[in-house]
A protein has these predicted regions:
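Extreme N-terminal, non-catalytic leader segments
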Residues: 1-26
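Glycine-rich, often acidic-flanked micro-motifs
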Residues: 20-34, 48-199
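Conserved lysine of the Walker
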Residues: 39
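Post-Walker A alpha-helix
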Residues: 42-43
């Protein structure tokens, strides 16, 4: 689908990441996390506070420019996140719920707000995010080696040698963070700092 959308061959993509691409002020960062870690919920919260959803779950990156491309898919919201998001998205109360049998999940879909964002933008870093009600808040920078170990299992990376070399060079220059939170307001405030280069 992404190849048809942007008229690009598979060889022209650096990779596709299982992440949320979040944009603000011309910057884009990729938020990654295991299922149940709050990745899509945090994306919806950030969208409600001035950030843009560039893509959710399926994030394509161009091999030539290493830019993140917009992907027009809705944000999947799990049942247990509905109460948290209803104050910002009342439409979720009446949205149809779907049962994803293979994953044993019940989800509703939230349209992304990204009409004003460009179709592509440079990546400014990776954030490995996790909601943990029992853990203290922390946001720490991690090495690109540790980050690489985290992204590979859930990503498609081009097997072409030139693209692989480009990816390694590009990824080694990215800022990578691990963000653990138990308070939504604190998480949003910290992400604002990331986009303002205050960390």
């Amino acid at each position: 689908l992404v190849q048809v959308l942007y008229q690009k061959k598979e060889t022209e993509w650096l990779g596709v990441f299982h992440a949320s691409a979040v944009g603000k002020n011309g910057k884009c960062m990729l938020f990654l996390g295991d299922s149940g870690n709050g990745k899509s919920t945090s994306l919806a919260l950030l969208q409600a506070h001035g950030f843009e959803c560039i893509a959710d779950d399926f994030v394509p990156v161009d091999a030539h420019s290493q830019e993140v491309y917009k992907f027009p898919a809705a944000i999947s919201i799990k049942r247990n996140s509905i109460p948290v998001l209803l104050p910002y998205y009342p439409i979720l109360e009446i949205s149809e719920e779907f049962h994803l049998k293979q994953l044993d999940k019940h989800v509703r879909y939230l349209p992304p707000v990204n009409e004003l964002s460009p179709n592509k933008m440079p990546c400014d870093g990776f954030v490995f995010i996790k909601y943990d009600a029992k853990a203290p808040f922390s946001c720490t920078q991690i090495s690109s080696v540790r980050a690489f170990e985290k992204i590979v299992p859930d990503s498609w990376l081009s097997p072409i040698a030139a693209n692989a070399a480009t990816f390694l060079n590009w990824f080694s220059k990215q800022r990578c963070y691990e963000l653990i939170y138990n308070d939504n307001s604190e998480m949003i405030s910290e992400v604002h700092k990331l986009y303002s280069d205050e960390l």
